[in-house]
């Protein structure tokens, strides 16, 4: 545990990773150590063969290849750290090939389904409904990560640090790895936020919070609505609108934002910047979605063999 604590401190100090990323590293490392303990293997006397057995163990527990790859990468980084600190001279993961897997195309909502959600939320004039309407409009208009959305501060989106400020249509957020990027939102999102700001005090009073810096304050430990709570609210909207709750989540709204931009003719590099992807290959998944969309559209072409027969 001592080495793990040192490694996590290094990640926090040098790589500026988010709390969620640090927790993910910690879980992977603790799971790995539990495995080693069960096998009576010392982490400082481990072999590449031991690592291969561990990977086989993970696969036998039906862990997805993507998750196995993440765990392997975590352990590889951990041993690189141990070497740099002179705790060991050997990285047993160095020559391990990552399992191959097929990228699944992300689920997206159609534009009509998005409209259905927004229309439903716009009719709920309770404080909770007005807040949810603002959050969904903002998420779909911007493609923010859910962690970025819920932790927005008044100063991020308003011209001054009070709820009386003007809502910016263009503002900046700090994304993964503390990388700043520009966010642009539409008029509908702006109007929904303005309406929400009129009743925001309801949530401040409800939370009995003295921390007024967050756009969406709550009684949660962090001072703002949790990602989990927002996801639950989205599921309830799906049920009320007749949509599959499994197909309505913050991340699916982000996917839908990107896919709809591409369908509308936006440049892939622009979408990459808006999403905050470090690598364009991550964004290219949406081109496959767009291709599938075009293929389905072509099924309705009059010369398609399934719908039109030449005499």
From Swiss-Prot:
Q: Where is the active site?
A: 145, 176, 251, 254, 277, 286 (o-(3'-phospho-dna)-tyrosine intermediate)
Q: Where is the Core-binding (CB) domain?
A: 1-83
**What InterPro entries does the record point to?**
CB, DNA_brk_join_enz, Integrase-like_cat_sf, Integrase_catalytic, Integrase_recombinase_N, Integrase_SAM-like_N, Recomb_XerD, Tyrosine_recombinase_XerC/XerD
Q: Which PROSITE patterns match?
A: CB, TYR_RECOMBINASE
Where in this chain does the record put each Tyr recombinase domain? 104-299
**Chief location:** cytoplasm
GO terms for molecular function, please?
Answer: DNA binding; tyrosine-based site-specific recombinase activity
* Localisation per UniProt entry: Cytoplasm
Keywords annotated in UniProt: Cell cycle, Cell division, Chromosome partition, Cytoplasm, DNA integration, DNA recombination, DNA-binding
Would you kindly state one Gene Ontology biological process term found in this protein's UniProt entry?
Answer: cell division
Tell me which GO cellular component terms the UniProt record holds. cytoplasm
CDD domains the record matches: INT_XerDC_C
Q: Which domain of life is it from?
A: Bacteria
Which Pfam families does the entry mention? Phage_int_SAM_1, Phage_integrase
Q: How does it assemble?
A: Forms a cyclic heterotetrameric complex composed of two molecules of XerC and two molecules of XerD.
HAMAP family noted in UniProt = Recomb_XerC_XerD, Recomb_XerD
Family named by the database record: Belongs to the 'phage' integrase family. XerD subfamily.
Main function: Site-specific tyrosine recombinase, which acts by catalyzing the cutting and rejoining of the recombining DNA molecules. The XerC-XerD complex is essential to convert dimers of the bacterial chromosome into monomers to permit their segregation at cell division. It also contributes to the segregational stability of plasmids.
Matching entries from PANTHER family are given as: PHAGE INTEGRASE-RELATED, TYROSINE RECOMBINASE XERC
Q: Under what name is this protein listed?
A: Tyrosine recombinase XerD
